[in-house]
Amino acid sequence: MIQISDLTFSWPGQSTPTLKINNLHIKKGEQLFLHGPSGSGKSTLLGLLAGIHTAQHGTIEILNENLAALNDAKRDKFRADHIGTIFQNFNLLPYLSPIDNVLLGCNFSKRRQANLKAINITAEAQALKLLNELGIDEDTQHRSVNELSIGQQQRVAAARAFIGQPELIIADEPTSALDADNRDIFIKQLFEQAEQYQATILFVSHDAGLASLFDRKVSLKDINGASL
């Protein structure tokens, strides 16, 4: 699913690299927990995986596609087609309903639309299915998302990530605003959706206590030569 090899990334004007990763492999269908404290380069790595940044050296391959070989437009298309994201601030549009926010995950990807057509379901039907399975009831589905609790907004963001069956889900500190009970419930729901849609999960957090819930734990400190 993901292969990182001999990667080096530095921000402009920086004398030393932020990231220097010789090797990281993530298998298809794996649920990987990537741990690192604030400022360790976690978000930078996710930006590289999402094609938002490009490394000065080395390769990142996702689904056997070398991201560095793609131009900006093709990287944007690849991200829209194959990667669902759940970020700490959710990036929901406050004036839209949960359903309309979820549908945005499909609106910019013909591949995701084709994935749904192949299983004979409309985007709206899958949006409703995802929201129901993630605990957003029918009444809440039609309210503005700015009326929802943090936990509800988080589940809307998760539904948006999964719609159209992208192969990779990237979650960046999505549970930081939740208490322990709601955090564990959300992660369980995330795993259920990933299993149903055969998605790989890369979950990034500073909270090492979450590691036991995942198939595999990787510490960014252990693989990032720039931090040594």
Residue ranges of each PLM-predicted region?
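Helix-to-loop junction immediately C-terminal to a conserved catalytic motif
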Residues: A50
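Conserved ABC transporter NBD signature motif
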Residues: G58-N66
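Conserved ABC ATPase "signature" region
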Residues: N66, A118-D139
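Conserved ABC ATPase signature
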Residues: S144-L148, Q152
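Hydrophobic anchor residue at the start of the ABC signature
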Residues: A158
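Conserved catalytic motifs of ABC-family nucleotide-binding domains
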Residues: Q165
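Catalytic Walker B motif of ABC-type/P-loop ATPase nucleotide-binding domains
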Residues: I169-D172
